[in-house]
Amino acid sequence: IISRGYKRKTSGMIILSDKDDFRTVGDEPIQYFKKFKNEVKVMVSENRVNALNVNETDKIDVNILDDAYQQRLVKPDMNILLSSIKRPFYNDYIFPVGMLREYRKNANRADFLIFSGCLVWYY
């Protein structure tokens, strides 16, 4: 998993380890690391291309770029768009009026659309 590490107090590329905390790598990357430990490599980097190059050298098969829908320097094999069911992207507006970082029409770049917060019905 490659994340920018929003609001972290450091810069550059960091491969997460037990010595890191939310201040050095950001809150979401530390959650990923704590959940998956040694099963998944978690990195933070402002430069996603450099991080991908490191992973290519390490022969990583799958790279998940967290919050990278707007990342134009990387050509993804697959784009996944997540949207809250309580505030779906198609009823929202671009920031600062709404919560969207891009125009709604750009949802057409998504290969998959996942709505979070949906009720699950069992029969």
Regions found by a protein language model. Give the residues of each.
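Phosphate/Mg2+-binding loops and adjacent switch elements
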Residues: Y6-Y123
